[in-house]
């Protein structure tokens, strides 16, 4: 998506501002008695408190998007041995960064970008669009589940530098079945392992909040030893969340409108959209957003 250009006043305000989340939800990742669905339902419930109803739209509508985010939520993902905290914008449910147990914030972006997080965050060194995280691969290639989330949390919690840790992790994982793929990925991109872990969390948490279909699919296979993946169609829908939200506003004014790009996604009307999407992005502001953790790739 298009990146924003912040005014000097915006930059100063963000630099001096300490983020205070509206709420923090804790998810004990390895607790088999705590369903993924319960975690997502709890976070959605708190997000909806900050949403509005819009005439003609079935789903709750998120707060208006701001150049400098005003509303945040945190989710703390805890394993038996470690934890990380995800910082998510309330106005668009984009993951902006994560905090390690040592208190270090890692933020999507690179030198020269504008920090959105406080507490002296460090740049991850790459952006947060799906194109940045998985290249041209489809989201159906992302394997998720309780075990995948556990590994992601444990690995990301140990992050200390931009590249050296990823190289160490790849060496440690060379005995795994996918060792050849990991080695090839590391040779091409030293941060490939970090990107792989982050995209799993983005889909399971952020897209799980946005999409009914995603949360149901992930929940159904969350405890599977083999993990769970989205369908090709679900993956394409996820990457068009912004466009689906725009369509929801169009259908609010013109209920019988035929929207070709929605038909290509298997969404014929607002009833079908409501079955698929749980939370709609507010379209009443023309504000463009910064590239953050799970931007739609519509405008890439």
Swiss-Prot record:
Top EC class for this record: hydrolase
Gene Ontology MF terms in the entry: rRNA N-glycosylase activity; toxin activity
Localization annotation: Cytoplasm
Active site per UniProt: 207
The EC number(s) this enzyme carries: 3.2.2.22
BP GO annotations: defense response; negative regulation of translation
Catalytic activity: Endohydrolysis of the N-glycosidic bond at one specific adenosine on the 28S rRNA
Record's keyword terms, sorted: Cytoplasm, Hydrolase, Plant defense, Protein synthesis inhibitor, Toxin
Disulfide bridge positions per record: none
Gene Ontology CC annotations of this record: cytoplasm
Tissues showing expression: Accumulates to high levels in seeds.
InterPro entries noted in UniProt: Ribosome-inact_prot_sf (IPR036041), Ribosome_inactivat_1/2 (IPR017989), Ribosome_inactivat_prot (IPR001574), Ribosome_inactivat_prot_CS (IPR017988), Ribosome_inactivat_prot_sub1 (IPR016138), Ribosome_inactivat_prot_sub2 (IPR016139)
Function: Possesses features of some constitutive defense agent. The coordinate Opaque-2-controlled synthesis of this protein and the major seed storage proteins (zeins) may provide the germinating seedling with both nutritional benefits and protection against pathogen invasion of the surrounding endosperm.
Complex formation: Monomer.
Sequence similarity: Belongs to the ribosome-inactivating protein family. Type 1 RIP subfamily.
Name of the protein described by the UniProt record: Ribosome-inactivating protein 3
Source organism per UniProt: Zea mays
Gene name per UniProt: CRIP3
